[in-house]
Amino acid sequence: MVKFSIEKKTILGRLGKIDSWGPVDVNHATPSCMTYLRAGHIPHLTWDVAENQLKLSQTPIYQMTLPSLISNAKIIEKFGKGVAKFVGMGALESPAIHLSPFDPLGKLPSGYNDSKSIAIWTANGKVSLDVKTYRNTVNSFGCGSFETLVDYDLPRDAGHKKLLKAVDRTTTFNEQIFKQDEKIDGERIVALGGGFSKYHRRKCAVDIGLAENTAAYTVEFHEFVEGMETDEMEMKELLEETFSPLPPTKLRCISGPFNPKTVLFLVQQGIDLFDSSFAIKLAEEGHAFCLADDYPTSSKYEVVDFKDQEKFADDFTPVFDGCGCYTCTKYTKGYLQHLLNTKELLASILLVIHNMSEYDRMFKLIRKSLENSEGL
């Protein structure tokens, strides 16, 4: 089970703790984030580097993303020992793993879902994922939890007919995957959709969110990630409509590369668990970020582009003063810029280590702020 408890409610958000994730004891405080994996690894890091140089503040909950592994699904099933051992996580001590059918950094083009399947996008193109295939994949991967299928194809201009069809599809997928005569392993994290419509957000929540044995909820919000829709009032209203008919004690998750400002806002709306894809996205763009000294009192943060040759070529100061991560204690701005411009693999490794460390520190600061806030 996903054993979650709310320890404190404030106007700034919910302070909670995840005691177990599936069969694994984690003792993981929230708000926090899952550790985003691509092809079963933190992008650009080997497991040896991750264990020795990436010092996270809590026992990780790993987000295993399906698009990078779906082509190996039959091989993993034949392998018979689960996805963790297949991708080399066997050396980790009882990792807590969540299976997501989508990659938060992947594309989700419109127009490819149908009544029998959801389109996911891999390096080789579109794969249509139906319920039977997904159930078999969930069972063979052996993760502690899995996310249910949701029809995400609801752009802002979607009409009532399209919205209703998408919600009905999501409901049907849920009914089919949990058929009584079909076995499925792992805790269910119910994915809630509905696009930009408050009515359909609530309808989806009522139709599938009240089912028994629901371990947690995740909100489909890919239209609101950085660079796309960011209307905070609209986000607030959609989340209120989604969660108001649901049990308030369940864990609430969201997936996507949300920046520190948006994370702080979503925490205030009651979201408990995010993912670390924002840190990876920045690193793959040659960027590093640093929170303002007064975060989260203010939501400010700085993003530095280390591809800027003129600015950093002769700068031999630490990457970020005061940061205790491996990157900032061992390397300089000038050297990092040199690595990026010569396309050295070490550049991405160092940026991922720093950004992951800073994203982890961000949640630690948010939790400390909630601890010091007046309870409701």
Curated annotation (Swiss-Prot):
The record's annotation in NCBIfam families points to: tgt_general
Reported cofactor(s): Zn(2+)
| Entry keyword Cytoplasm | yes
Annotated Zn(2+) binding lies at C323, C325, C328, H354
Per UniProt, subunit arrangement is:
Heterodimer of a catalytic subunit and an accessory subunit.
CC annotations in GO = cytoplasm
Which UniProt keyword terms apply here? Cytoplasm, Metal-binding, tRNA processing, Zinc
What does this gene product do?
Non-catalytic subunit of the queuine tRNA-ribosyltransferase (TGT) that catalyzes the base-exchange of a guanine (G) residue with queuine (Q) at position 34 (anticodon wobble position) in tRNAs with GU(N) anticodons (tRNA-Asp, -Asn, -His and -Tyr), resulting in the hypermodified nucleoside queuosine (7-(((4,5-cis-dihydroxy-2-cyclopenten-1-yl)amino)methyl)-7-deazaguanosine).
Which top-level group of life is the source organism from? Eukaryota
Q: Where in the cell is it found?
A: Cytoplasm
Q: What is the free-text note on the cofactor? A: Binds 1 zinc ion per subunit.
- Give a yes or no for keyword Nucleus in this entry: no
Q: What is its main location?
A: cytoplasm
Any idea what this protein is called?
Queuine tRNA-ribosyltransferase accessory subunit 2
The UniProt entry, under InterPro entries, shows: QTRTD1, Queuine_tRNA-ribosyltrfase, TGT-like_sf, tRNA_ribo_trans-like
Q: Where is the signal peptide?
A: none
